[in-house]
Amino acid sequence: MLDTPVIAVAGATSKQGRSVVRSLLRGGDYRVRAMTRDPASQMAKSLERQGAELVTGSLSLGSDDEWVDAFSGARAAFLITPPTPPKGSREYELGCRIADAAVRAGVEHIVFSTLENVDKITGGRIFAPHFTDKARVADYISGLPVASTFVILSFFYTNLMEYYVPRVEDGSLVLPIYLPED
């Protein structure tokens, strides 16, 4: 078991992180190190019961040494950045620093969950920093001395139930998603 490669998963208790941890554990080819700000949380303990190793690794600026420790000994790392409020977004800096910590720890391969660069695509007409900042982090990771893979996922269906709760109006199902008219 000690020869089995370790994959560290940042944001392991998030929707995406939990899915990655569970999939890797089910595959059985890797040991999974689940990075979370609170290893004592119910969600983290659930991952531990499934076979993940829990380590402290908060997705917040100033956790650089914590990240290096969490990534140490891992062959690869799955990284996410949490969406942050548009004003004062530090997602780009956070993503770069997490990736740098993985490289400093000796990780050989980074998998990063990214999105499209909306600023570039629209010539700056549409403001979507949670997309653009992730794309900029992917560009940064591409320049690091490690192998890298980037995944772009669709909208999470569960977000409909949490943020855009469907409702019935006049006999029609309405999904209150904010989209431009064009």
Where are these regions (language model features)?
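Oxidoreductase cofactor-interface core, primarily capturing Rossmann-like NAD(P)-dependent enzymes
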Residues: M1-S46, L61-S72, A76-E93, D100-H109, ...
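Rossmann-fold cofactor-recognition segment
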Residues: E48-G62
